[in-house]
Amino acid sequence: MPALPLDQLQITHKDPKTGKLRTSPALHPEQKADRYFVLYKPPPKDNIPALVEEYLERATFVANDLDWLLALPHDKFWCQVIFDETLQKCLDSYLRYVPRKFDEGVASAPEVVDMQKRLHRSVFLTFLRMSTHKESKDHFISPSAFGEILYNNFLFDIPKILDLCVLFGKGNSPLLQKMIGNIFTQQPSYYSDLDETLPTILQVFSNILQHCGLQGDGANTTPQKLEERGRLTPSDMPLLELKDIVLYLCDTCTTLWAFLDIFPLACQTFQKHDFCYRLASFYEAAIPEMESAIKKRRLEDSKLLGDLWQRLSHSRKKLMEIFHIILNQICLLPILESSCDNIQGFIEEFLQIFSSLLQEKRFLRDYDALFPVAEDISLLQQASSVLDETRTAYILQAVESAWEGVDRRKATDAKDPSVIEEPNGEPNGVTVTAEAVSQASSHPENSEEEECMGAAAAVGPAMCGVELDSLISQVKDLLPDLGEGFILACLEYYHYDPEQVINNILEERLAPTLSQLDRNLDREMKPDPTPLLTSRHNVFQNDEFDVFSRDSVDLSRVHKGKSTRKEENTRSLLNDKRAVAAQRQRYEQYSVVVEEVPLQPGESLPYHSVYYEDEYDDTYDGNQVGANDADSDDELISRRPFTIPQVLRTKVPREGQEEDDDDEEDDADEEAPKPDHFVQDPAVLREKAEARRMAFLAKKGYRHDSSTAVAGSPRGHGQSRETTQERRKKEANKATRANHNRRTMADRKRSKGMIPS
């Protein structure tokens, strides 16, 4: 009888409560063992004995639990994996907190290293068994049910898969490729999850650009927030903040490269989001700025800056390798594997990608240094006889133009963008360390083992003074026939490493630029810089008291404390009318309107015949010109209407009394004198008071609702609907009538015995 898959298998067991036999599915929560998996924590950064002991104890629990899990039979294993939430949290904590190979770390104790290796192996075997649906011919799960179990129970997701690739891809590539391929094959829904995850991955690049104060892709920019207007550039931000950005970029690039290297079938999903163009534009905008920021901080922490430069170089290399993997998977491999009839679409895709990147000159130059574009185009020419030569020539010409002014031979030999020179001829980056160069040349097979060592470079300040003289003397003591100028050139080339200079000179392995120099070249002594005090510039430069620019100073104008000549100086200053006399003639020119124009005998007005008009000019007659205090009494009377003095008026109105238009009209009708009653009519007084109250309420905007029907009917006869509504309205709005919870407070007093009930 053939064995049934685990998802269809039924097992018979005894009910612990009734003692009777019953049948239940093999995958059931009751089959789960009662075991708690503790969370993983990373090893301590400081080798403090107490922290190391705590880590070893916790890691031992995790390792023992995983070993117990791996030893379970097929059905028990899957019940524990599916229904035990603590197991999933334990595995997630390991993927999240375990140190990556490119993370900062210190030398751990040997027992910590051994425990890390044991945990690493146990976690990998656990995920490997979780991704296998058939262990043997008797223990397996049907493929359709296996995919549903993985997807519905969140045993795998895209972030977990990315972490698995970056953690276990080195050394376990075949097993990891089979594992992830099986997951995507049995559950195609992970492709849609990856498609939904890619906008988040692209947002990582946008966040880095925004945090660096760089403008991203114009098609994807959003309105800028007010608090984002003052963002710092990489050159201005603090060093620790720059360090966080570089580490974040290094982690992102390494993770994406590891995933695409393990599972290249995901390249199609990446390219759906125009990933190649977004990657190249990010490289062009961010990488040069970060390089410049590191180079400008040469005088700061050299060890930290060397580590940042190494990680940035590693990130650059991974970005270009990601681009190459995608290009190779979606264009080049299909061309090599397909027939001649089916390759035109892939060739068009290749040409379209590079046509969109022609303005990214820095990216093209660095990519061409690692993966020559001419070789790929040569492959296209061999595969297709109808290739558009105009487009290919245009792309090659754009790549060549990106190399203008750059030492291409040096960059191609290095096979790394960190040694490429800028168009101005200066090295693009900090000098590469001699140790990294020697290791790369003598052990090329180890370059792939240390992924983080790609293009290792260190930042160091330029030597000068006593330090430089000491280095030159170290070399000259062993090689006295060499000139100091030649030794200085060698030290500058090999980053001031005297051991490397001596070794290369003795082994005749100097760089070509150094071999052409004269070995007896003398050292050129640089002139001393200008002293600071003789080159200062401020607001007192070259004044009468500047002792740095003149030898003699008028000491009579220098006094200590209060000057004795202050009174004389003040009086002489007030009596000095030279400034007034100098301005008098200028202001006299403004008096162009005069009553009489003095003329010499026989002279006439030169402008009389031109500007004279016999018509009277009344333009300004209606304007009041001049001050009122200089006017005569007649003019004041003519301008101001005559009014009766207050003392002569028959009726004196009260000051500050404001009356409306309606009241004025009523007063106009009642101007006749009224008899003075000793006691006025109360009805008239009530009408006036009511009128004043209604006028006041009208000004306040209040409208009294006179349609109240709260009287109601006698008790026992029921109430009308209007009465009920009015009572409800009165109860809801009683606060407007100064009823401050009287019923509530009265009940409270009565309940406390204040008022006898």
Curated annotation (Swiss-Prot):
Tissue expression profile of the protein: Ubiquitous.
Pfam family, one: CUE
Modified positions (Phosphothreonine) in chain numbering: 233
Chain segments carrying region Disordered: 617-687, 699-757
InterPro entries: ASCC2, ASCC2_CUE, CUE, UBA-like_sf
Record-annotated CUE domain positions: 467-510
Highest taxon in the source lineage: Eukaryota
Signal peptide range in chain numbering: none
Annotated compartments: Nucleus; Nucleus speckle
Any one GO MF annotation of this record: K63-linked polyubiquitin modification-dependent protein binding
UniProt biased composition (Basic and acidic residues): 671-687, 719-734
GO cellular component terms given for this protein: cytosolic ribosome; DNA repair complex; nuclear speck; nucleoplasm; nucleus; RQC-trigger complex
Chain positions with Phosphoserine modification: 447, 632, 713
Compositional bias of kind Acidic residues: 657-670
Keywords assigned: DNA damage, DNA repair, Nucleus, Phosphoprotein, Transcription, Transcription regulation
GO terms of biological process kind: DNA alkylation repair; regulation of DNA-templated transcription; rescue of stalled ribosome; ribosome disassembly; ribosome-associated ubiquitin-dependent protein catabolic process
Subunit structure: Identified in the ASCC complex that contains ASCC1, ASCC2 and ASCC3. Interacts directly with ASCC3. The ASCC complex interacts with ALKBH3. Interacts (via CUE domain) with 'Lys-63'-linked polyubiquitin chains, but not with 'Lys-48'-linked polyubiquitin chains. Part of the ASC-1 complex, that contains TRIP4, ASCC1, ASCC2 and ASCC3. Component of the RQT (ribosome quality control trigger) complex, that contains ASCC2, ASCC3 and TRIP4. Interacts with CSRP1. Interacts with PRPF8, a component of the spliceosome. Interacts with ZCCHC4.
Domain comment as written in the entry: The CUE domain specifically binds RPS20/uS10 ubiquitinated via 'Lys-63'-linked ubiquitin chains by ZNF598.
Annotated function: Ubiquitin-binding protein involved in DNA repair and rescue of stalled ribosomes. Plays a role in DNA damage repair as component of the ASCC complex. Recruits ASCC3 and ALKBH3 to sites of DNA damage by binding to polyubiquitinated proteins that have 'Lys-63'-linked polyubiquitin chains. Part of the ASC-1 complex that enhances NF-kappa-B, SRF and AP1 transactivation. Involved in activation of the ribosome quality control (RQC) pathway, a pathway that degrades nascent peptide chains during problematic translation.
UniProt similarity note: Belongs to the ASCC2 family.
Protein name: Activating signal cointegrator 1 complex subunit 2
Taxonomic source organism: Homo sapiens (Human)
